[in-house]
Amino acid sequence: MTSALHESSIKSLPLLGRGKVRDMYAVGDDKLLIVASDRISAFDVILDDPIPGKGQVLTELTDFWLRKLAHILPNHSTGIQPEDVVAPDEVDQVRGRAVVVKRLKPILVEAVARGYLIGSGWKDYQASGSVCGIALPAGLQQASQLPEPIFTPAAKAEFGMHDENVDFAHVVKEVGQEMAERIRDVTLRLYGEAARFAATKGIIIADTKFEFGLDDNGTLHLMDEVLTPDSSRFWPADGYRVGISPPSFDKQFVRDWLETQPWDKTPPAPRLPRDVLEKTAAKYREALDRLLA
């Protein structure tokens, strides 16, 4: 397998923080260097074993979608090459896995679009017949396609905690009526266009999560990762069946293996065997290869 990057170490720039996957550095006062590591998390625990090549896949896919969807909404891209903002001996850490982006004020709402009933949406529907306050028809099954895509926001949780599904009124309270409607409408438009494109490649985008931010003029921008296996459920269309949870192009191998282990889902997690690492890396790569083919 190719070598993997668990954690970047860019000494030439101030480190602002590390998320589950990304490390963030300041580039002056108005830009950020974001490095996508090969870290992987499961059950909100960061694992010790990285997935080789994962960070490059996430970066390449996000770049692809940002260019493809740029006519809908401005995004955080600057066009500056990450190799140009780090020291020469740090270039290998950023090549193919980092971006230099505008420093935006993040909107603290997860903008989720769902076209299919799965995951927390399926659990909510089973309990109440609705998702995020949106009533759905009776009789839907797990993985059913919805009559039309829906906007199902979530409140950002503290690190290590699960995001909480909320209704549209919560978003209005956070950002105001006009901005809430703008976020909802653009989320559904981005999802719709991406889902139609992915369908031509034999991939169903069941749901996805977008992140938005504002520039100094208050203009809404698309930011962070976009339509990757980490932020979306990608299903192979030929494996889709209503009533079951379809296979997906993501870390399912990792989750499934961990479920077989005597582990209480608190750190530290068990070490992953080589075959699980290799299969997971291949799934991420397959999603990229299919979409960009």
From Swiss-Prot:
InterPro entries: SAICAR_synt/ADE2_N, SAICAR_synth, SAICAR_synthetase_CS. Keywords: ATP-binding, Ligase, Nucleotide-binding, Purine biosynthesis. It catalyses: 5-amino-1-(5-phospho-D-ribosyl)imidazole-4-carboxylate + L-aspartate + ATP = (2S)-2-[5-amino-1-(5-phospho-beta-D-ribosyl)imidazole-4-carboxamido]succinate + ADP + phosphate + 2 H(+). Its EC number is 6.3.2.6. GO terms for cellular component: cytoplasm. GO terms for molecular function: ATP binding; phosphoribosylaminoimidazolesuccinocarboxamide synthase activity. Pfam families: SAICAR_synt (PF01259). GO terms for biological process: 'de novo' IMP biosynthetic process. Pathway: Purine metabolism; IMP biosynthesis via de novo pathway; 5-amino-1-(5-phospho-D-ribosyl)imidazole-4-carboxamide from 5-amino-1-(5-phospho-D-ribosyl)imidazole-4-carboxylate: step 1/2. It comes from the Bacteria. HAMAP family: SAICAR_synth. PANTHER family: PHOSPHORIBOSYLAMINOIMIDAZOLE-SUCCINOCARBOXAMIDE SYNTHASE (PTHR43700:SF1). NCBIfam families: PRK13961.1, purC. Belongs to the SAICAR synthetase family. This is Phosphoribosylaminoimidazole-succinocarboxamide synthase. The gene is purC.
